[in-house]
Structure formats: structure tokens, C-alpha cells
From Swiss-Prot:
GO terms for MF: histidinol dehydrogenase activity; NAD binding; zinc ion binding
Residues the entry annotates as binding substrate: S243, Q265, H268, H334, D367, E421, H426
Species the sequence originates in: Pseudomonas aeruginosa (strain ATCC 15692 / DSM 22644 / CIP 104116 / JCM 14847 / LMG 12228 / 1C / PRS 101 / PAO1)
Protein name as it appears in the record: Histidinol dehydrogenase
Pathway in which the depicted protein is active: Amino-acid biosynthesis; L-histidine biosynthesis; L-histidine from 5-phospho-alpha-D-ribose 1-diphosphate: step 9/9
Family according to the record: Belongs to the histidinol dehydrogenase family.
GO CC aspect terms: cytoplasm; cytosol
Pfam families according to UniProt: Histidinol_dh
Residues that hold NAD(+) according to the record: Y136, Q197, N220
Cofactor(s) essential for the protein: Zn(2+)
UniProt entry keywords in alphabetical sequence: Amino-acid biosynthesis, Histidine biosynthesis, Metal-binding, NAD, Oxidoreductase, Zinc
Role this protein plays: Catalyzes the sequential NAD-dependent oxidations of L-histidinol to L-histidinaldehyde and then to L-histidine.
Amino acid sequence: MTAPFAIRRLNAADPDFGRHLDHLLSWESVSDDSVNQRVLDIIAAVRSRGDAAVVEFTQRFDGLQAASMADLILPRERLELALTRITVAQREALEVAAERVRSYHEKQKQGSWRYTEADGTVLGQQVTPLDRAGLYVPGGKASYPSSVLMNAIPAKVAGVSEVVMVVPTPRGEINEIVLAAACIAGVDRVFTIGGAQAVAALAYGTESVPRVDKIVGPGNIYVATAKRHVFGQVGIDMIAGPSEILVVCDGQTDPDWIAMDLFSQAEHDEDAQSILVSPDAAFLDRVADSIARLLPTMERAEIIRTSLEGRGALIQVADQAQACAVANRIAPEHLELSVADPESWLPEIRHAGAIFMGRYTAEALGDYCAGPNHVLPTSGTARFSSPLGVYDFQKRSSIINCSAEGASVLGRTASVLARGESLTAHARSAEYRILDEKEA
């Protein structure tokens, strides 16, 4: 017999609300010492033995019999074949989603700029793409073609010359729709490897796997730990925590809609977090009833139940101002403003990965096909970080081109500051370029 469902209820008027909220939001990665050491050993092996180590780990962890790295490379023709092996509806959905993602990210492209000062000195900024990006994609039946689109398309829009995808194929299991997504997104090379060994291969390069400049994409605790260790050798997107959603509702949305929106994140895994905030206590009761009634109808009911009971909450607030204060404190990955006039709320929202405005804007639309990226900051990091975008695959270089007059004027200032820091060579380097009065 299934136990009665119970989700945490909080009230922002409670004197201990802050402490209870902190407890609700607390989450620590489970990367313990044993995981950390295993990852370090794998990275060291890949650095020293290259392809041989990658093949060995792939055989051991993925149950895949490969004689050499040649068996772990998928040519472009294989990606094109995948397009013919998925349904017409799947291909059309991928193409629609890809076009919307591409169109949105085209608007994020940053351009170079410069300006000229009165003395002829030119200052500016040059924007250039990364040479090569690595994309990690989880493998097996539970893999996510939408993640391929969201990670690869911004890189190609940015002008990255080569996108290298790694995707494990446990026991040889290949997900055709993931390969089809890679084809549509413009992925250049695919290796059927995964885990920490794939991250290490991308970061340091092997005889077959080219070294990349940045690694993006989700993965398990071994992948996340490996990304943390190779950061600095390469760039990474983020160390993502569990998925999360915060719904703020005025009490006028269908409670079944809200319940299903909460489920949409809770079904990811047991650590996912789904929270509803509303000033209407009776509405919170109705949503709780909807959750209890709809939960048994869900395919992933036990995962949803564990997530909601362990990390979910229904929070009552006094008004819009308090709701926004709670939202900013949580800084959620996904924020739904399921209210009558979401535009009036927007100026008060400072911290959120993505903001879904109005009753009709389900978070699931953003996950797949709205256009904005679904790779978002989690665990409160929206306080200081942003969604993945084109700018993550571009670099900026400062441009300084001094005229003789400009170098002379700046040289005097630089000399004073350099000598104040006792850096004589700096000072003299600037002073050599100072014009004497008859030259000026």
C-alpha cells in the first residue's frame, strides 16, 4: 500500500522561516573522497597513456568491446544515417527546435568595437570565437537530444570551428535521436566515450581525441568531478546541481497545471527541487490535492514523490513584494511567474536562470523549443551567473594602438605609477616614448 503523500508547508510569516528555507535549499554534491581519487587516477592515466587508457576504461565501464579508438569514432555519415532512422515527427520537432534555438542565439552575438581619441590613439575590443569546443552528452536510453541542440548550436553561432561531441554507448547502445540532433546542430566529430575518461581526453587530448578549449554539457558525479579538476586547463560551462523550479502563483491558475509544472522538474531525479509560492493558502491546499491525485498517474511517480517529499515545498507569503523577496533569496534555475500581470513583477526579480512569464508559459517549453538556452545556473548560482549562450564560446581581446602623441601623454602617467610600484623597467619603457618638447 502506498503511503499518503506529504509535502512540506512553510509560511514566510513564521519567525523561523529563514532557517527553514535555508535547510530546504541546502544541497551538497556527493563527490566523496573515493570518487575524487578515482577521477584523479583516470585523468592521470589518460594524460600518460592517451588512447590506450580511454579504450581500457570504455571497455571496463561501458561494457563495450573496442580494439582501438577507431572503433569509438562515429563518422559524419553515421550521424546522417541517424536522421533516416528516427520518425518524421521526431525529425521535424528537432528541426523546429534547432531553428528556434539558432534564431534566439544569433541575437546574442557580440561584435568587435573601437574608438579613436583626439590624439589619434585607438582603443577597442576584438571578439573572437574559441577554436574548438567539447560537448559531453549522457548516453544510453535516458540521453537528451535537446541538450545536444542547446550546447552545440550556440557554439556554432559563435563561430567555433570544431565542436567535438563525446557520448557513451553502454553495451553498444546507441541513441539514434541524439545522433540525429548532433547532425542537425552541426557537430563536427563524435566519439562514443564517456565518464571522466572522456572529459580528460577532451581536456588534454590524445592521439585521436583533439584537445578542446572548453567543455560543456551535463553528466553524472564522475563527469562533474572531472570537469572540476580540468578547469583551468580548459574552460567549463558550470558544475550543475539538481534541476529546480520555483513557481510563483497568484492563486488564479488551474491547480492541475501548477502540479504538473512542479512534476516536470521533480521527475528528473530524487534530488530535484520543486517549490510553489503563493499568497493564497486555499490555493496551496488545492495544489496539494492536485499533486496527490495526479501523482499515481505519472510514469516516474516514485522519483517525483521522493523529490517532492524530500526537497519540495508549498510556501505561503503575504504579498507580491514578499513573493519576490523569497524568489530572489532562492535564485532558482527556473522561475515561473504564473500571475495576471507578470510584466509588473519583472523589475523586482533580480536572480533567476530563466523567467517564464504568464500562466501559459510552461517551463517545459523552455526545456525544448522556445529558443532560450536550457543550460541554466542551479543551486542559487543565478545570483552571479547566467544561462549558457553564445558569449560562452567567444573571447574578448583588448585593442590599444597609441599614436606618438598618445604614447607621450600616457607615458608620463604610466611612469609615475610604475615608479610608485618600484617597477623601474616599466617606467623606463614608457619614458622612452615620451616626446621632448620640440618633438611634441
